[in-house]
Amino acid sequence: MDLFPPKFSKVLVTPDPQYIPGYAGYCPQLKYHVGQTYGQLTAKLLTSPEVSHSQRLVLQTSPLSSTEKETASRSQIWWSRHGASRNLETMIPGYTGFVPLRQNYICKTYAETCRDALSEFNQGQAKRLHNASADLSFPVINSVPDFRPRRSNSPLIALSKDPAPYKAPDPWKPPGSPYFMEDSSPHKYFISGFTGYVPKARFLFGTGYPTITNKALIQFSKEMKAGPASLQKYSLQEEDSSNLPLIPTIYPSKTGLLPSYTGHIPGYRFQYGHTFGKLTHNALGHTASQKNAGAIRLS
């Protein structure tokens, strides 16, 4: 009876030699045997004297002496440059930073791959600096006997302890809202993407948005300057053909607003179940209950 139990169970763990599942290499007479697991079957075939084996091993253990020496020297190079506080053995997978030359190393743990890659990179950097320094020829600065280094100039003397602040002769001023600009102002327009309400803009199309809003605002300003009394007597024949049809009010009392109107409509957010035109019918003349009753009558 054994004094100490084995570390691994011979029933649960197949003893060596064996191939682990997923091995894509050749195993003699594997395709002629069935009924066992891959590990048990390969262990039986590799140890059975009845199976003819190759006189030369296909797989063999690589030497470790040179690898251990290279690993030790590379670790010393890394610690001499970055200090012993940077322990590469604790580096875990998932690091998203750049590790130079890491793509050249495979079949190792992540920490070993990073350590070898960084050590090789440091060796290459040191070799490159050594070769570059050997090609440089440093000039002798004090080759002239009477050479005196030039002294730096002292800072300028301040003319005043409390200098006056600088004021631009033509300071920039914000142009203001396009609604209140003069008709001749080149900034009287809205840029593309503006979602606010632009009066008279719904009758214009075929040009860019800044051009449309400029014409609409100019026409709206003319109507506002003319006054409400003269709006009814305003004649379209007296103006050029670019003038727009008159709309004395923004919210008509007899009809609803057109779809895609982006301005504010009192009480519209609390209504639903009808079209946009029915819900905006006489937006300023009724309460919410009166609007709903009117929408029902229209339907």
UniProtKB/Swiss-Prot annotation:
GO-annotated cellular components: axonemal microtubule
Source domain of life: Eukaryota
Main location: cytoplasm
UniProt-listed Pfam families: CMI2B-like
Tissues and organs where the protein is expressed, per its UniProt entry: Expressed in airway epithelial cells.
Record keywords, A-Z: Cell projection, Cytoplasm, Cytoskeleton
The keyword Glycoprotein is assigned to this record: no
Keyword check for Cytoplasm: yes
Intracellular or extracellular location(s): Cytoplasm, Cytoskeleton, Cilium axoneme
Family designation: Belongs to the CIMIP2 family.
Protein role: Microtubule inner protein (MIP) part of the dynein-decorated doublet microtubules (DMTs) in cilia axoneme, which is required for motile cilia beating.
Name this polypeptide is given: Ciliary microtubule inner protein 2B
Organism of derivation: Danio rerio
